[in-house]
Amino acid sequence: MGRGRVELKRIENKINRQVTFSKRRNGLLKKAYELSVLCDAEVALIIFSSRGKLYEFGSAGINKTLEKYNSCCYNAQGSNSALAGGEHQSWYQEMSRLKTKLECLQRSQRHMLGEDLGPLSIKELQQLEKQLEYSLSQARQRKTQIMMEQVDDLRRKERQLGELNKQLKNKLEAEADSSNCRSAIQDSWVHGTVVSGGRVLNAQPPPDIDCEPTLQIGYYQFVRPEAANPRSNGGGGDQNNNFVMGWPL
């Protein structure tokens, strides 16, 4: 039956701790020796006990291995330092270049503003004059372009307002005509006139006409007896028509 898994924590019992240290130390030294022999590796092992006692193993000697270790660490630190120094040098050169460019731009700006012109030669002043003329020309062109765009915008708004004003005017005229027509119709009903096609017609009923209605049946005409009286026509009425009391003979 195998042993259970050992819990990795400090052994509280002093005797057991000392026994375990001795066993594990001897095993570790044995493994270091086997590794150096089997793999032809340079192995160095240094152990200090809890009481400060030194135990060591070196396949090629502890001092030689330590010197080799220190040499490797120093070279690594030197290479890192060289890389850091080169990076710092690169940043310093970039900073110097940007600083020089900034000073040049500031000096050019002062010249554009008419400052510090004393040290400039005639050729430099002529070049500065050309630059100022070019800048002035560009500024004027840009100003003219902006003004033309604003004028076009104002004209477009003016056309829109004109169309809107025309629509409102037509709408008001149509509403006024409709209102006048309704008023005229109302007045016509009050005063007995009717407006038709722009003409005023009299809507009052015509006066009574003294006439007698007639009734025609077929091809015969009925006449009231008073109208058929021959005396009203000066006599001789019976001899001139074929009607007697409205009926044919």
Swiss-Prot record:
UniProt cross-references to InterPro entries, sorted A to Z: MADS-box/MEF2_TF (IPR050142), MEF2-like_N (IPR033896), TF_Kbox (IPR002487), TF_MADSbox (IPR002100), TF_MADSbox_sf (IPR036879)
SMART domains on file: MADS (SM00432)
Main location class: nucleus
MF terms (GO), sorted A to Z: DNA-binding transcription factor activity, RNA polymerase II-specific; protein dimerization activity; RNA polymerase II cis-regulatory region sequence-specific DNA binding
SUPFAM superfamilies the UniProt entry points to: SRF-like
Source organism, top-level taxon: Eukaryota
Record's GO cellular component terms: nucleus
Domain MADS-box: from-to ranges: 1-61
PROSITE patterns: K_BOX, MADS_BOX_1, MADS_BOX_2
Residue ranges, annotated region (Disordered): 228-249
Keyword Transmembrane attached: no
Phenotype of the disrupted gene, per the record: No visible phenotype, probably due to redundancy with MADS6.
Compartments, as annotated in UniProt: Nucleus
Pfam families reported for this sequence: K-box, SRF-TF
Record-level GO BP terms: positive regulation of transcription by RNA polymerase II; regulation of transcription by RNA polymerase II; specification of floral organ identity
Domain annotation K-box: ranges: 88-178
CDD domains documented for this protein: MADS_MEF2_like (cd00265)
Function summary: Probable transcription factor. Plays minor but redundant roles with MADS6 in floral development.
Name of this chain's protein: MADS-box transcription factor 17
